[in-house]
């Protein structure tokens, strides 16, 4: 039985396995009669993937779903190749970049692109968060590629295949030349790799989008109404501009309310740089600098305490819980700074946090968008209380012990 990749035409997630197949020299058949929404709902398909997602690879030994898993399987079909590295450390680094490009790059591109296409609800703050996270990831990738042609070693590996396929979604949809020009080494890397023969066989002639797609509008899906009355020329002509105006109307609302607050003498990015760049004498330099900068009129400080600490019996589960919270806070990165302390040498671990937010209250869009907020008790800091002020300083500098307990970990959101 030949390998069969069940997917629809143009599925960018399926391209990873097809490119890997070119490198290892194996044949993969792609059925031409696959219909999304039909074929993937059949009993035969659901036996291969119970939730009906594509792509799915059918092999003589069984089926495999999830695009990265499929690409990994294909890359190992012929052992005489370098796609998985030549040593254990190279293999680990390949896996590292696969995870990085999937979790940091691809996920952020989807969160930017998806809402604009109507695949999920659009939120301006959420889009800002996605773009901010994507830029941070691309900046890290750009730094690595400053002195490296490929991600691992001196030839193309599976990490390059998956990363470039992930980048290709962004280049094709939302990442314009103006956007990617901030990351010249990423640009060089992307165009070098997509023009390799084994890539062009699958991807064809890759082009970069010239514009970010407009936000999908429900009203845009109703152009048939004017066409139903073609003889009444005056009505459609008069109504068409109104439709356009209605579609344009949401654009001013995209402005985040926090951007409309009176200017603050505290520049959040200046504080974040001071925090990151202070390597010694932290209390004398960074903490003193924070209080010199802090503007209680333009910003507010908040303590948070996890409500269900008795559940935090396993260290890595607790750390993952906090890490997930910080990931979901990405939409607020422009307007906030946070420290999360995981306290205790054994379970149950206590999770305590300190957050700096733009404005006098916790921004409403954060409360609405980040479900984790409800899992914490929030208390506004009274900086006139020297004990509370000292607690803020200790949390910023990861003082240990903190309130009589060792620190399992301290995470910074900046």
From Swiss-Prot:
Composition-biased stretches (Low complexity): 214-224
One GO CC annotation: plasmodesma
InterPro entries for the chain: EF-1-gamma_plant, EF1B_G_C, EF1B_G_C_sf, Glutathione-S-Trfase_C-like, Glutathione-S-Trfase_C_sf, Glutathione_S-Trfase, Glutathione_S-Trfase_N, GST_C
Pfam families, per database record: EF1G (PF00647), GST_C (PF00043), GST_N (PF02798)
Span of domain GST N-terminal: 1-82
GST C-terminal domain segment(s): 87-215
Limits of the EF-1-gamma C-terminal domain: 254-414
Protein name: Probable elongation factor 1-gamma 1
Species, as recorded: Arabidopsis thaliana (Mouse-ear cress)
């Amino acid at each position: 039985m030949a390998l069969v990749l069940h997917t629809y035409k143009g599925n960018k997630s399926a391209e990873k396995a097809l490119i890997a197949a070119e490198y290892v020299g194996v044949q993969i058949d792609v059925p031409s009669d696959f219909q999304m929404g039909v074929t993937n709902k059949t009993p035969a398909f659901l036996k291969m993937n119970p939730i009906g997602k594509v792509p799915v690879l059918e092999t003589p030994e069984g089926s495999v779903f999830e695009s990265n898993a499929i690409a990994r399987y294909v890359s190992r079909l012929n052992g005489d190749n370098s796609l998985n590295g030549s040593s254990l450390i190279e293999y680990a680094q390949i896996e590292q970049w696969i995870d990085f490009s999937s979790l940091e790059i691809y996920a952020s591109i989807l969160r930017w692109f998806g809402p604009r296409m109507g695949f999920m609800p659009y939120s301006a703050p959420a889009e800002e968060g996605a773009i901010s996270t994507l830029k941070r990831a691309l900046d890290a990738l750009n730094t690595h590629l400053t002195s490296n042609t490929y991600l691992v070693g001196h030839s193309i590996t599976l990490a390059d295949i998956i990363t470039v396929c992930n980048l290709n979604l962004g280049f094709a949809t939302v990442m314009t030349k103006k956007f990617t020009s901030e990351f010249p080494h990423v640009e060089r890397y992307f165009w070098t790799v997509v023009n390799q023969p084994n890539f062009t066989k699958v991807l064809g002639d890759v082009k970069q989008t010239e514009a970010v797609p407009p936000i999908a509008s429900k009203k845009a899906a109703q152009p048939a109404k004017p066409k139903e009355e073609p003889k009444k020329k005056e009505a459609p002509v008069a109504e068409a501009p109104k439709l356009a105006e209605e579609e344009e109307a949401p654009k001013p609302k995209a402005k985040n309310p926090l951007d409309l607050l009176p200017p603050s003498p505290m520049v959040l990015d200046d504080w974040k740089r001071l925090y990151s760049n202070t390597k010694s004498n932290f209390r004398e330099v960074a903490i003193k600098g924070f209080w010199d900068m802090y503007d209680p009129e333009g910003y507010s400080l908040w303590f948070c305490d996890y409500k269900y600490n008795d559940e935090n019996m396993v260290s890595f589960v607790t750390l993952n819980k906090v890490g997930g919270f910080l990931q979901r806070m990405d939409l607020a990165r422009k307007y906030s700074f946070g420290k999360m302390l995981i306290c205790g040498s054994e379970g149950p671990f206590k999770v305590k946090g300190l957050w700096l937010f733009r404005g006098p209250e916790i921004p409403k869009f954060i409360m609405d968008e980040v479900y984790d907020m409800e899992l914490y008790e929030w208390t506004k800091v009274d900086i006139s209380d020297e004990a509370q002020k000292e607690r803020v300083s200790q949390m910023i500098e990861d003082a240990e012990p903190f309130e009589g307990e060792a620190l399992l970990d301290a995470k910074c959101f900046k």
